[in-house]
């Protein structure tokens, strides 16, 4: 009769719960026999259809009124009690020996509904004995008794149906031994605050009258009466009220799911008085559910149980289990499938829909510690507002190992793509062909990728300009010189395609120190005179070079170190022409035409010479103090141009131009005569 109670509508559909209507009819019949009762007030307060129906005030009024009119009610309730006991005995199979006391209360109008309830049972305890308790001579109805206990009106003059000294309870200790596991969790302790006398000891009682089938909250007693006898059976028999017959109005303060022998008494204990020789311990191996009408649950409660009332009836028909680890008809060792399948409607107030329940099943010492957790699906991560133009390279032959940084940019840390000679490994973002382009200037090659506040990728120049000035870098500042940052992948000198050096542009600091270093550095190499045909390996460095290392080499990872000097063989017999010319700066230029070579000794990559192994070059070295510059201008011979410039700050290589796809910024002879004015942009591209 309770399974149709709604769990989320506290006031709108109360009429679907027959308990409210039956209690109203019963209380109305009680109050009609009283002369001094304010009949209109109680009828209005008992009307469950009133929207502002106050349960607490209603209960208190009933309790106060029952305290004053207890004796008048007993005569009327005794006749109803006899009728109820006779009907109950027919339904449950127990004999009516006039020993029921006040088991049925005064709610005789709903005794016909007892057929919906199965025989009384205890899910984990088998009935063995039945102890008949004589009827108390001066008894009260359970309703009156509960109201008195609820309002703390436990007067010694008022007798209870359990205050007979001859009453005794035989407790089988085989099912009382406590175990180590507990299956409970706390709920809202502030739901309907009020007096609590469940565990208050009463004199001359074998056990507390309210501790057998009540909650820690005392408010449930006046609203819902028990329909099964409580006073004449032992625990081994079927005196434990079923979950469908004794409902708590308010969620108990300490537990909703409890492991107790009593379905509705998770923490009840027998007072150690009278003939009782042992306390009643909780059976932690059994799981019992306190059925609470959902329409009485407050929104502050932690858990609401929407649909498990349908399963309570099936639970009440479950055969008796012998295994202490098998609550209901299943064991928790099977993964909690029964509970997950039948009780998946446990929701929190903030949840719109029930979430799946997961069990952590790890039996320990033949006991189970099942932790019930309502798994809330984590909301997916918010989609980033950043618009990224990063596209993943689908070339599996390269198989790069990428790393996603915290900002979302993809950095290739290891790649099998190398240059044409197979030397070197791409180890930087400038070398990875990931398709990343600057959203401002559109460049795809930069020593350092940056991001704007929106998360879009920017090159180092645009990103640093935005960081320093706070505005977007104007495209007018972007010149063709910035394309010299690119490093070609087709050069045959073995240069690493991923080095982020600055060999094409010299910063002011390295240029200012050029004059301070006289010899042995990359800008002013000292000529080394050796025998003809001597082969220099790039792994063996000259003593002068090993002693001093220029600032330029520290900043740029100089491509000069990667020069394969083993390919350099200059013979004096092959020099066919030595001519001296004058450049625009009136500096002598000596062209050494290296003939007889079908292909240049350097392939496609010109570079500076740290040392020349030809005596012929050493003859003209005395006239040239500035760095030598080598250019492979044609395929039939190699033109080595040694250019002395008065503008030392404008020194650059043709390598910077030949790696470009359009060869912008280079003249026909391959010699760059650009001045320092073209290097004003360089401060944007330096790594500080």
Swiss-Prot record:
Composition bias type Basic residues, residue spans: 382-397
UniProt main location, coarse: nucleus
GO terms (BP aspect): negative regulation of transcription by RNA polymerase II; positive regulation of transcription by RNA polymerase II; regulation of nitrogen utilization
Key words of the record: Metal-binding, Nucleus, Transcription, Transcription regulation, Virulence, Zinc, Zinc-finger
Biased composition (Basic and acidic residues): 359-368
Any Gene Ontology CC annotation: nucleus
Subcellular location: Nucleus
Free-text function comment from the UniProt entry: Transcriptional regulator of nitrogen utilization required for nitrogen catabolite repression and utilization of isoleucine, tyrosine and tryptophan as nitrogen sources. Controls expression of the MEP2 ammonium permease, the DUR1,2 urea amidolyase, and the transcription factor STP1, which in turn mediates SAP2 expression, a long-known virulence attribute of C.albicans. Influences the filamentation process depending upon the nitrogen sources available. Required for virulence in a mouse systemic infection model.
Protein name: Transcriptional regulatory protein GAT1
């Amino acid at each position: 009769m309770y399974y149709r109670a709604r769990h989320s509508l506290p006031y709108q559909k109360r009429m679907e719960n027959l308990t409210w209507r039956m209690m109203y009819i019963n209380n109305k019949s009680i109050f009609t026999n009283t002369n001094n009762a304010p009949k209109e007030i109680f009828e209005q307060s008992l009307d469950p259809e009133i929207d502002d129906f106050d349960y607490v005030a209603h209960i208190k009024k009933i309790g106060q009124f029952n305290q004053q009119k207890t004796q008048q009610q007993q005569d009327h309730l005794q006749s109803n009690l006899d009728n109820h006991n006779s009907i109950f005995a027919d339904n449950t199979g127990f004999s009516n020996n006039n020993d029921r006391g006040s088991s049925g209360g005064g709610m005789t109008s709903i005794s016909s509904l007892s057929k919906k309830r199965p025989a009384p049972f205890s899910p984990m305890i088998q009935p063995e004995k039945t102890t008949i308790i004589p009827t108390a001579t001066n008894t009260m109805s359970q309703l009156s008794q509960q109201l008195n206990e609820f309002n703390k009106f436990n007067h010694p003059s008022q007798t209870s149906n359990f205050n007979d000294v001859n009453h005794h309870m035989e407790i089988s200790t085989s099912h009382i031994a406590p175990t180590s596991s507990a299956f409970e969790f706390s709920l809202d302790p502030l739901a309907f605050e009020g007096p609590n006398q469940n565990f208050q000891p009463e004199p001359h009682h074998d056990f507390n009258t309210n501790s057998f089938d009540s909650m820690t909250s005392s408010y449930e007693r006046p609203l819902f009466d028990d329909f099964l006898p409580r006073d004449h059976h032992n625990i081994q028999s079927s005196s434990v009220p079923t979950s469908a017959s004794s409902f708590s109005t308010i969620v108990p303060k300490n537990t909703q799911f409890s492991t107790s022998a009593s379905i509705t008494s998770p923490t009840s204990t027998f007072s150690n008085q009278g003939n009782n020789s042992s306390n009643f311990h909780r059976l932690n191996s059994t799981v019992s559910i306190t059925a609470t009408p959902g329409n009485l649950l407050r929104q502050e409660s932690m858990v609401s149980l929407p649909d498990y009332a349908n399963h309570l009836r099936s639970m009440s028909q479950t055969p008796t289990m012998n295994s202490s680890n098998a609550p209901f008809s299943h064991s928790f060792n099977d993964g909690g499938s029964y509970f997950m399948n039948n009780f998946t409607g446990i929701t929190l107030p903030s949840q719109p829909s029930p979430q799946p329940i997961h069990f952590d099943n790890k039996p320990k010492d033949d006991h189970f510690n099942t932790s019930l957790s309502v798994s809330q699906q984590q909301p997916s991560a918010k989609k980033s507002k950043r618009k990224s133009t990063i596209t993943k390279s689908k070339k599996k032959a390269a198989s790069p190992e990428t790393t996603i940084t915290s900002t979302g940019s993809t950095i290739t840390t290891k790649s099998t793509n190398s240059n044409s000679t197979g030397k070197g490994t791409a180890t930087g973002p400038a070398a990875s062909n990931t398709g990343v382009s600057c959203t401002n200037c559109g460049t795809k090659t930069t020593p350092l990728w940056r991001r704007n506040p929106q998360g879009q990728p920017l090159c180092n120049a645009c990103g640093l300009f935005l960081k320093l000035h706070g505005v977007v870098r104007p495209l007018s500042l972007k010149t063709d010189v910035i394309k010299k940052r690119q490093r070609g992948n087709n050069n045959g000198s073995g240069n690493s395609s991923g080095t982020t050096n600055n060999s094409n542009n010299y910063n002011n600091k390295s240029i200012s120190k050029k004059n301070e270093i006289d010899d042995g550095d990359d800008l002013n190499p000292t000529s080394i005179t050796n025998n003809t045909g001597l082969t220099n390996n790039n792994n063996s460095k000259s003593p002068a070079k090993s002693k001093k290392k220029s600032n330029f080499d520290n900043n740029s990872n100089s491509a000069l170190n990667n020069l394969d000097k083993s390919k350099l063989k200059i013979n004096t017999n092959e020099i066919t022409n030595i001519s001296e010319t004058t450049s625009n700066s009136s500096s002598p230029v000596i062209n050494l035409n290296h003939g007889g070579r079908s292909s240049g000794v350097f392939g496609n990559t010109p570079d500076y010479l740290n040392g020349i192994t030809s005596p012929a070059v050493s003859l003209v070295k005395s006239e040239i103090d500035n760095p030598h510059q080598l250019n492979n201008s044609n395929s039939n011979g190699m033109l080595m141009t040694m250019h002395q410039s008065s503008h030392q700050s404008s020194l650059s290589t043709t390598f910077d131009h030949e790696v470009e796809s359009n060869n912008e910024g280079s003249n026909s002879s391959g010699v760059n005569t650009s001045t320092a004015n073209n290097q004003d942009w360089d401060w944007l591209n330096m790594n500080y």
